[in-house]
């Protein structure tokens, strides 16, 4: 029968010229007509005896395709019905042998699974119909798992060993491999058992970097534009290209990556929907990978010993997509997420060693032991998926963005090292060959690093994918507020803040134990990464022009969560984390490039939860960030306060309700507001002193180096190189301190104008006056020339603007008698002539001040001078004051003496209040101290009053004589 011969391409005729295989079998005599009864014999011969058939699986596929073609050709022919049974038999046997060939490797004479897979991958479209039939047959026969165990471990071997790189550079190969996965998992019975394939899971001992090579899904989950080889291919040829050219490469890779993610999601989604077991296995697989990769968020991660950025980021994106249905804007399924998820006995996520939001390990373990759920109470997929996504946001995508953040310094160091080696090469011919080899390695490393950075920036600039991530973060923010809400009804019912009464007392700024004891359960026991991951991502992504944060309709949810965390200090104990929150809010507060309001300002104004709580939250955190618990806490606080100052300034000028709130706080919550002003004063005092001192050092070193360059003899011991190092250090510190001081000074200006009373309380006013006088002397006094440096703007230093700001504060407080008195009492720095000099600079020399401004400043200086003279006369009246009447810290006569409980020292109430604003201990023995524990010394107060009265009467008596 010709049809059978044509389909199977075999003949019994030795003279046949069609090139078909000549059948050599005793079962079929030469010249016999090949009927249906011989099909099985013919196929067996071809597969098991024909030595010339070197591609048996390809042969079966070709037979199948030819059979389908013959069906179509003969469909309308007269003998179609008689041929139908023949074609059916060929299909049955070819598909059957296809199943056998893919299950028993040595069944065919030249059989080899790797050859079959190589053939399929190289031309997958021609195999899809045949493979579909094989899959269905295996399912019917109950041998589907055997089929899978032959195909996919071999496919893994192919990806690892039989292509140079399985990545986006090999477009045909990776697309065809994805097609194979898609084809198989489309069949639900396959998806149900797919996770049972040998090699789907890695051994527990598997190293983090081996998941991509040793697990079935590993290679396809690694397909990413941020893999090194892909980055070099796309970005490495021309690292100096234009921004437009770079953007075009970004867009091309983004489009390709989007398709890859869509296809990966299709595959994993089929597995998740396959069965309860396959769904659980997928979660377990992803969790195992995350648990092995905690070092990705270490300070110095050993990235070569961890899973790759592409692999971890892809899994993050997939999990984010799985979370979308239950975190959509309607929040109809938000109650499906188990708030007590971490109470489950068999968690996939490894929490050992995880820092908690506001509890120690021992307390957290005790809580979970006491409240552990029963073994049969397993969490639902939604809860597993949600918390695993948060885990990956921290260790997956979070590790990737951390990697990118470190690359800038890496590239800079490599470039410096290359220049250094080039100079050595130019001066040492004897080492030329060795140096050239080293230089080549370093330049290759630089090219790789720069290419990777471009690739990572392109990845994070991919707005559509990053929008999905930030949407998840907004949904997660809403859920976390719901967990904290005592009623657990948010967002359908507004949460009421604060959760516990505010701790206003000046000595309670660091009452960590109290806050921990009152933190809400179970939120306080959550791992810190549930907050840190979203915060790190949001802060990082905000620097991109395409950032998903900008003008995002769901941004309000995240700002609400941020406000809640700052407003309720008991929620999160880590001040660094809260520092990042205020940094992010400052980004959203700053005006945009077109000078329009910051992209969060509308939320600050119109979101009810935010508008009611943000101002208090910022003022409170400004105070309590004083102590961060780290070795760098002294400087950490300045960065956080700088961010807060940016927000406060924008709120004050742009949104009237915040200005009204601020004034209300100063009038009705005086202790709280004074605490804030005291911290501002501490910072400004230090920063101005630090900034101006370093500018003086810069001035001196610049002069020394200039003089040496002109041939003058050195006046300092340091060599030029050491001087350059010291100059760089002083310049950095001057720039940092002056920049931070400028923002604090701005707040002093605007607040002292509208709320002057807050700046003249007894515990504040003397320190404020001293600070202003000292810095006025620095700017216009005899040593002001030491502040002249080259390019002062580069240090964020504008002496004229600073002088104008300082004198503005004097004018703002000029009607306050307490302030006039405090300025006059500053014997160290107050001098009326300094004000005259300031007026000359601001008026005649620069024109920065109006005649009205100058008049007010001189009037204030005259009042202060008159007060100084009056104070001198009063001091003469009092003469020698008994030591017991003098404040032991300020050496002034006490007005309201109190006794400290531990040291039993007498001290003025205003002095100890000022001390407790920044230190909650007795200044004489460092024992803990609260203001309410001091005892008024009424007897001593009366003695002092009698002393003053007596001295005044004596003075009057002398004057009348």
From Swiss-Prot:
Pathway: Protein modification; protein ubiquitination. GO terms for molecular function: ubiquitin-ubiquitin ligase activity. It is an enzyme of class 2 (transferase). It holds the Pfam family U-box. Gene3D superfamilies: Zinc/RING finger domain, C3HC4 (zinc finger) (3.30.40.10). Belongs to the ubiquitin conjugation factor E4 family. Present with 2600 molecules/cell in log phase SD medium. E4 ubiquitin chain-elongation enzyme specifically involved in polyubiquitin chain assembly. Binds to CDC48 and elongates mono- and diubiquitinated ERAD substrates presented by the UFD1-NPL4-CDC48/p97 (UNC) AAA ATPase complex to a chain length of 4 to 6 ubiquitin moieties. Delivers these polyubiquitinated substrates to RAD23 and DSK2, which target them to the proteasome. Has E3 ubiquitin-protein ligase activity, accepting ubiquitin from its cognate E2 ubiquitin-conjugating enzyme UBC4. Enhances ubiquitination at 'Lys-48', but not at 'Lys-29' of the Ub moiety. This is E4 ubiquitin-protein ligase UFD2. It comes from Saccharomyces cerevisiae (strain ATCC 204508 / S288c) (Baker's yeast).
């Amino acid at each position: 029968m010709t049809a059978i011969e044509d389909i199977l391409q075999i003949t019994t005729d030795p003279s046949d010229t069609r090139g078909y295989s000549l059948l050599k079998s005793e079962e079929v005599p030469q010249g016999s007509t090949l009927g249906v009864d011989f099909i099985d014999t013919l196929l067996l011969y071809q597969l098991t005896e024909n030595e010339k058939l070197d591609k048996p699986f390809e042969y079966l596929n070709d037979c199948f395709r030819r059979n389908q073609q013959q069906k179509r050709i003969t469909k309308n022919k007269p003998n179609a019905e008689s041929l139908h049974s023949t074609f059916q038999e060929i299909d049955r046997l070819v598909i059957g042998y296809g199943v056998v060939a893919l299950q028993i490797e040595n069944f065919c004479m030249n059989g080899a699974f790797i050859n079959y897979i190589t053939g399929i991958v190289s031309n997958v479209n021609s195999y899809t119909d045949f493979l579909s039939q094989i899959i269905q047959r295996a399912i019917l026969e109950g041998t589907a798992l055997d089929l899978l165990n032959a195909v996919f471990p071999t496919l893994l071997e192919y990806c690892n060993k039989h292509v140079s790189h399985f990545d986006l550079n090999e477009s045909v190969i990776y697309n065809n491999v994805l097609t194979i996965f898609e084809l198989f998992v489309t069949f639900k019975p396959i998806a149900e058992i797919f996770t049972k394939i040998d090699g789907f899971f890695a051994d527990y001992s598997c190293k983090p970097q081996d998941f991509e090579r040793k697990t079935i899904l590993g290679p396809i989950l690694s397909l990413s534009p941020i893999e090194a080889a892909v980055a070099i291919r796309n970005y490495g040829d021309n690292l100096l290209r234009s921004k437009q050219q770079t953007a075009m490469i970004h867009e091309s890779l983004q489009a390709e990556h989007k398709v890859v993610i869509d296809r990966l999601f299709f595959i994993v989604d089929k597995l998740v929907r396959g069965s309860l077991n396959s769904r659980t296995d997928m979660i377990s697989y992803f969790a195992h990978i995350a648990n092995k990769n905690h070092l990705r968020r270490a300070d110095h991660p050993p990235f070569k010993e961890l899973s790759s950025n592409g692999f971890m980021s892809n899994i993050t994106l997939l999990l984010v997509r799985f979370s979308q249905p239950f975190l959509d804007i309607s929040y109809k399924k938000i109650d499906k997420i188990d708030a007590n998820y971490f109470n489950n006995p068999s968690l996939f996520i490894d929490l050992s060693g995880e820092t908690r939001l506001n509890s120690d390990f021992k307390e957290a373990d005790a809580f979970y032991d006491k409240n552990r759920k029963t073994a049969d109470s397993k969490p639902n997929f939604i809860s597993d998926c949600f918390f695993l996504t948060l885990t990956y946001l921290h260790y997956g995508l979070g590790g990737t963005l951390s990697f990118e953040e470190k690359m800038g310094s890496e590239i800079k160091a490599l470039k410096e090292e290359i220049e250094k080696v080039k100079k050595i090469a130019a001066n040492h011919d004897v080492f030329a060959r060795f140096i050239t080899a080293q230089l080549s390695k370093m330049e290759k490393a630089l090219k790789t690093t720069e290419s990777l950075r471009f690739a990572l920036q392109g990845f994070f600039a991919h707005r559509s994918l990053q929008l999905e991530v930030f949407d998840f973060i907004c949904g997660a923010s809403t859920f976390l507020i719901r967990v904290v809400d005592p009623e657990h009804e948010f967002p359908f019912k507004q949460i009421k803040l604060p959760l516990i009464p505010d701790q206003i007392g000046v000595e309670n700024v660091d009452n960590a134990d109290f806050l921990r004891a009152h933190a809400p359960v179970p939120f306080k026991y959550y791992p810190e990464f549930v907050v840190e991951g979203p915060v790190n991502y949001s802060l990082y992504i905000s620097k991109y022009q395409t950032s998903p944060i900008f003008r995002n309709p769901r941004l309000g949810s995240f700002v609400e969560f941020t406000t809640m965390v700052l407003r309720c200090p008991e929620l999160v104990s880590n001040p660094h984390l809260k520092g990042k929150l205020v940094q992010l809010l400052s980004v959203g507060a700053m005006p945009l490039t077109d000078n329009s309001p910051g992209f969060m300002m509308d939320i600050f104004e119109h979101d009810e939860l935010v508008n009611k709580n943000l101002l208090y939250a910022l003022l409170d955190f400004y105070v309590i960030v004083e102590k961060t618990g780290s070795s760098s806490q002294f400087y950490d606080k300045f960065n956080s306060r700088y961010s807060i100052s940016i927000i406060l300034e924008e709120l004050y000028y742009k949104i009237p309700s915040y200005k009204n709130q601020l004034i209300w706080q100063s009038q009705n919550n005086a202790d709280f507001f004074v605490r804030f002003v005291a911290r501002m004063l501490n910072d400004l005092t230090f920063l101005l002193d630090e900034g101006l001192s370093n500018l003086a050092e810069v001035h001196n070193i610049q002069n020394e180096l200039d003089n040496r360059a002109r041939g003058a003899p050195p006046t300092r011991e340091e060599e030029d190189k050491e001087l350059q190092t010291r100059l760089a250090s002083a310049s950095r510190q001057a720039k940092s301190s002056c920049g931070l001081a400028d923002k604090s000074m701005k707040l002093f200006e605007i607040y002292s104008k509208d709320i002057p009373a807050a700046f003249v309380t007894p515990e504040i006013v003397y320190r404020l006056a001293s600070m202003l006088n000292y810095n006025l002397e620095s700017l216009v006094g005899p040593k002001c020339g030491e502040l002249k440096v080259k390019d002062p703007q580069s240090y964020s230093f504008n002496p004229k603007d600073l002088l104008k700001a300082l004198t503005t504060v004097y004018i703002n407080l000029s009607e306050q008698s307490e302030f006039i008195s405090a300025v006059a009492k500053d014997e160290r720095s107050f001098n009326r002539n300094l004000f005259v000099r300031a007026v000359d600079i601001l008026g005649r020399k620069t024109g920065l001040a109006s005649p009205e401004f100058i008049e007010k400043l001189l009037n204030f200086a005259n009042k202060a001078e008159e007060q100084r003279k009056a104070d001198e006369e009063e001091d003469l009246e009092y003469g020698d004051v008994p030591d017991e009447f003098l404040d032991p810290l300020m050496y002034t006569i006490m007005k309201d003496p109190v006794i400290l409980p531990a040291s039993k020292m007498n001290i003025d109430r205003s002095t100890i209040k000022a001390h407790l604003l920044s230190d909650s201990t007795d200044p004489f023995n460092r024992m803990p101290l609260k203001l309410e524990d001091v005892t008024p010394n009424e007897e001593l107060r009366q003695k002092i009053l009698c002393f003053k009265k007596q001295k005044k009467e004596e003075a009057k008596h002398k004057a009348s004589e």
